[in-house]
Amino acid sequence: MRQTLACLSAPALLVAATALSGCMQTGDGFDEPPAMRWDHRPEAAEWTQAAISALASDGAVLATTVPADIETFCPNYAEASLEERQAFWSGLFSALAQFESTWNPKASGGGGAWIGLLQIAPSTARAYSCDATSTSGLKDGAANLSCAVKIAARQVPRDNAIVDNGAPGWEGLARDWAPMRSSTKVKAMAAWTSKQSYCVKPGSRA
């Protein structure tokens, strides 16, 4: 599967990713919608759809990237389908949102410097050409997630890492999100994502 994904041209990848994300939203690829850490929230379906849609467009590169430290977060990722990889990235953002905002889309941290589900600064949103660049815009959960995917799509391939490729300094998502610099929080996030159906190796599934 890795070779197939790697050989797709950018337009073909976008078409494939969009088609597969549509299957996920209707449940065609899973017996039930893929699990997210925010599933207890009333906005859960909207947020998951927003994340998957962003991963099929601006963030399509994430599902074709195999980070050096992916085994920690998603043991089956290297062999996973494009759809399962998208589910993983969405799941990881849902886990990160717990530590950034406790899933509160209106959260404001750092004296108003960081906004929303993933605590994104308006200046950062502008730097990454996100659709939402204002405080009010970033308090929309779906828009905040779409922006987060754009940021990740730049940083993860740049370092070939979610948080660690063996080089010194902050890498991947740790460049922009403080919880990814905490070994305790990273361990908690990885413990959750790695046991989800889209990350468990087939032979290990119950």
Regions found by a protein language model. Give the residues of each.
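Short, functionally critical alpha-helical segments immediately adjacent to catalytic or ligand/cofactor-binding
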Residues: D69-A78, E84-N104, A148
